[in-house]
Amino acid sequence: MASDYTKGLSMKAAKLVFENLPSSYENGANDPHAREEMHNASCMAGMAFANAFLGLNHSMAHKLGAFHHLPHGIANAVILTRVMRYNAAEAPVKMGTFSQYPYPNALAAYAEMARYCGVEGKDDREVFENFCAKLEELKATIGIKGTIADYGVDEAYFLESLDEMVEQAFNDQCTGANPRYPLMSEIKELYLDAYYGREPQDYACLLYTSPSPRDR
């Protein structure tokens, strides 16, 4: 449900985060300007999603917090680029529930934000891949770990609670506003990929066909 109004806020917020989060994290009170800009970025991002709503990334993060007590920021960050790749598929099984556009456009929207943040590439797909790499670099800079398992989430309990987590994420209020409407089997694969650190997929037409959740 993004609009020209929310895009301006979200794009500026993202740029401020890239420019100021590393120093705010590293230097704290010794860099008050970076802290100020991060407060501004947080406020602008809130203004954007209060009007455009959120999506699957937040739905999945809500359940990681509820079931496994991951702080919400960490839960969002650890799955972020995987959900972005899922959303950026140009031939999804189902589109979003809100008819905002006649065809999938998440890839172009991600590329637009990426270019505003200084990311380059020969086409939208390359820009998007470079954007994901830039996000992973930022996450590493501030100590975000690579997988759900890295945060000490017990494997047996993760697998035991997975189906309930998937169902609750599917029914979360944020899911309906995602640009690509997910199947529960797709949410399950995203969780498993993020837990085990499996190689990212393009998620173009993802159905749950894995022989084992431990297949990495």
Language-model segments: which ranges?
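Short, amphipathic C-terminal "tail helix"
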Residues: 159-206
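Glycine-rich phosphate/pyrophosphate-binding beta-alpha loops
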Residues: 43, 47-56, 61-73
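Conserved small/polar residues in nucleotide/adenosyl-binding loops
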Residues: 208-215
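Glycine-rich flexible loops
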Residues: 2, 15-17, 39, 63, ...
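Carboxylate- and glycine-rich phosphate/diphosphate-binding segment that chelates Mg2+/Mn2+
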Residues: 1-52
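Short alpha-helical scaffolding segments that buttress acidic/His motifs in well-ordered protein cores
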Residues: 13, 38-46, 60, 80-84, ...
